């Protein structure tokens, strides 16, 4: 990677998240917008990426071919869909490009492909790039170690009507943080749905509830409930810019790293706390 400005490429440049990633890349010192990508056949191809994002002319035009811009970026930022991200991952691995992956909804094979690629390239892969969410994950680990053995743990998340996966990647990351703190595997203790006659709550499980409505950017709550008291730890996002800023900050953090799989807690040095 270059020692000067880190040049980033943005996938899905015409989407809501893509436009905010462009804004964030143009705003952060030490980062340069090198390329912007959209799918083949998009009406946005050839548009100026900065103008598309409402940030003024940049001279970077929206392209559909990664091969055409492979010399224009060092780190690829991807918040698209799993199938597209895995195609981009293969390209970046072949060409030695770092990646910041905010795509959610991967199956186990997809996650393994990311782990495998990290042997050759540096990747930041996180369910949520918000600073606040990642601080929350650390707090959940602490709370689980103190209260997790005797409380009922529930995770409630809410997002906009257009979100296609559930539970959210962030909700799953919350569950994994709690389960790990309790020396459990989330797949063995998660309860993702309840309906009809469920019987009493099974001790030691982690419940999930999902809301999809309106334009909710993202709300997540973890509840540790006992008889007589409960602790709730909540994060509410009011703008996608918090995710975009964190992702671009992660791209800058990758400077000088040749390989390895990292998450936002590494970027923020939360693992040392």
UniProtKB/Swiss-Prot annotation:
Localization (cell): Cytoplasm
Binding site for NADP(+): 39
A GO CC term assigned to this protein in UniProt: cytosol
Reactions this protein catalyses: (S)-2,3,4,5-tetrahydrodipicolinate + NAD(+) + H2O = (2S,4S)-4-hydroxy-2,3,4,5-tetrahydrodipicolinate + NADH + H(+); (S)-2,3,4,5-tetrahydrodipicolinate + NADP(+) + H2O = (2S,4S)-4-hydroxy-2,3,4,5-tetrahydrodipicolinate + NADPH + H(+)
Entry-linked PANTHER family: 4-HYDROXY-TETRAHYDRODIPICOLINATE REDUCTASE 1, CHLOROPLASTIC-RELATED, DIHYDRODIPICOLINATE REDUCTASE
SUPFAM superfamilies: Glyceraldehyde-3-phosphate dehydrogenase-like, C-terminal domain, NAD(P)-binding Rossmann-fold domains
Active site, renumbered: 159 (proton donor/acceptor), 163 (proton donor)
GO MF: 4-hydroxy-tetrahydrodipicolinate reductase; NAD binding; NADP binding; oxidoreductase activity, acting on CH or CH2 groups, NAD or NADP as acceptor
EC number: 1.17.1.8
One GO process term, biological-process aspect: diaminopimelate biosynthetic process
Protein name listed in UniProt: 4-hydroxy-tetrahydrodipicolinate reductase
Keyword annotations of the record: Amino-acid biosynthesis, Cytoplasm, Diaminopimelate biosynthesis, Lysine biosynthesis, NAD, NADP, Oxidoreductase
Binding locations of NAD(+): 12-17, 38, 102-104, 126-129
Family named by the database record: Belongs to the DapB family.
Pfam families reported in the protein's UniProt record: DapB_C, DapB_N
Residues reported in the UniProt entry to bind (S)-2,3,4,5-tetrahydrodipicolinate: 160, 169-170
Quaternary structure and interacting proteins, as annotated: Homotetramer.
Keyword Lipid biosynthesis: no
Major enzyme class: oxidoreductase
């Amino acid at each position: 990677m270059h020692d000067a400005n880190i040049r980033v490429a943005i996938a899905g440049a015409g989407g809501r998240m893509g436009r905010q990633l462009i804004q964030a890349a143009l705003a952060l010192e030490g980062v340069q917008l090198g390329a912007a990508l959209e799918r083949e056949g998009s009406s946005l191809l050839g548009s100026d990426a900065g103008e598309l994002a409402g940030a003024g002319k940049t001279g970077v035009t929206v392209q559909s071919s990664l091969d055409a811009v492979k010399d224009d970026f060092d780190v690829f930022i991807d918040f698209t869909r799993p199938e597209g991200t895995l195609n981009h991952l293969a390209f970046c691995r072949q060409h030695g490009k770092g990646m910041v992956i905010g795509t959610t909804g991967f199956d186990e094979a997809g996650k393994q492909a990311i782990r495998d690629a990290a042997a050759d390239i540096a990747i930041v892969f996180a369910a949520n790039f918000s600073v606040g969410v990642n601080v929350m994950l650390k707090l959940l680990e602490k709370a689980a170690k103190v209260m997790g053995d005797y409380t009922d743990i529930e995770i409630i998340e809410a997002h906009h009507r257009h979100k296609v996966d559930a539970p959210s990647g962030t909700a799953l990351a919350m569950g994994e943080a709690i389960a790990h703190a309790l020396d459990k595997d989330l797949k063995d203790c998660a309860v993702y749905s309840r309906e009809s006659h469920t019987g009493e709550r099974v001790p030691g499980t982690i419940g999930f509830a999902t809301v999809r409505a309106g334009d909710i950017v993202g709300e997540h709550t973890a509840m540790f409930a006992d008889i007589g008291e409960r602790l709730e730890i909540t994060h509410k996002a009011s703008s996608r810019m918090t995710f975009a800023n964190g992702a671009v900050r992660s791209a800058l953090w990758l400077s000088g790293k040749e390989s390895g799989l990292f998450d936002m807690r590494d970027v923020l040095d939360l693992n040392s706390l």
